[in-house]
Amino acid sequence: MEELPATAVGLKVNDGIVLASERRLSYGGYVLSKQAKKVYKINKFLMAGAGIYGDLQTLTRIMNVEIKYYEVSTGKPISVHAAAKLLSVILYQYKVMPFISEILFGGVDEKGPQLYVLDPIGSLIEDNYAAVGSGARIAIGVLESEYDPNMSLDVATQLITKAIKASIERDITSGDGIDLAIIDKKGNYENKFIPY
């Protein structure tokens, strides 16, 4: 499969989870937007991705509705793994006409921080860190060289920012700033924008 334009990176540490993406939206060598948010908060979870922007937005809307439906139907919150599995099933249902996107999905529940990587047909892989999109090869090298599950969320945020900046320097479809989303082990959410 051709590499999907954009770069998104996720990192799980003992204190929480961080997802980040750059903001450039490009197609066929053209920059369509410099303000495209590709990191989403869905209920108490985070999702980031690379690929067709409209597909990412559609998946975000579907997941918002499905998670709310699950919680209203069962009367209890959905776990991170169950929500990731739900996303996997949704992607698989569209395997004939797939959503053209690679996705990072994560959150924190009673089992601690969790990070999952999904491809366009719903393959679900749990990992400590991951990068997707056209800048993934560059970003993953930065993560591999410095990752430590015991690092603080502040250090994790610095590392993920360094990984995205490295991909922006080498990947023409990535750029125009960095969106970061953080959930700590207590479930507190924070988002940041870093101009670059």
Curated annotation (Swiss-Prot):
Residues 1-6 form a propeptide. The active site is at T7. It is found in: Cytoplasm. It catalyses: Cleavage of peptide bonds with very broad specificity. The formation of the proteasomal ATPase PAN-20S proteasome complex, via the docking of the C-termini of PAN into the intersubunit pockets in the alpha-rings, triggers opening of the gate for substrate entry. Interconversion between the open-gate and close-gate conformations leads to a dynamic regulation of the 20S proteasome proteolysis activity. Pfam families: Proteasome. This is Proteasome subunit beta 1. Its EC number is 3.4.25.1. Belongs to the peptidase T1B family. InterPro entries: Ntn_hydrolases_N (IPR029055), Pept_T1A_Psome_bsu_arc (IPR019983), Pept_T1A_subB (IPR000243), Proteasome_bsu_CS (IPR016050), Proteasome_sua/b (IPR001353), Proteasome_suB-type (IPR023333). GO terms for biological process: proteasome-mediated ubiquitin-dependent protein catabolic process. It comes from the Archaea. The 20S proteasome core is composed of 14 alpha and 14 beta subunits that assemble into four stacked heptameric rings, resulting in a barrel-shaped structure. The two inner rings, each composed of seven catalytic beta subunits, are sandwiched by two outer rings, each composed of seven alpha subunits. The catalytic chamber with the active sites is on the inside of the barrel. Has a gated structure, the ends of the cylinder being occluded by the N-termini of the alpha-subunits. Is capped at one or both ends by the proteasome regulatory ATPase, PAN. Keywords: Autocatalytic cleavage, Cytoplasm, Hydrolase, Protease, Proteasome, Threonine protease, Zymogen. GO terms for molecular function: endopeptidase activity; threonine-type endopeptidase activity. GO terms for cellular component: cytosol; proteasome core complex, beta-subunit complex. PANTHER family: ATP-DEPENDENT PROTEASE SUBUNIT HSLV (PTHR32194:SF0), METALLOPROTEASE TLDD (PTHR32194). Component of the proteasome core, a large protease complex with broad specificity involved in protein degradation. The gene is psmB1.
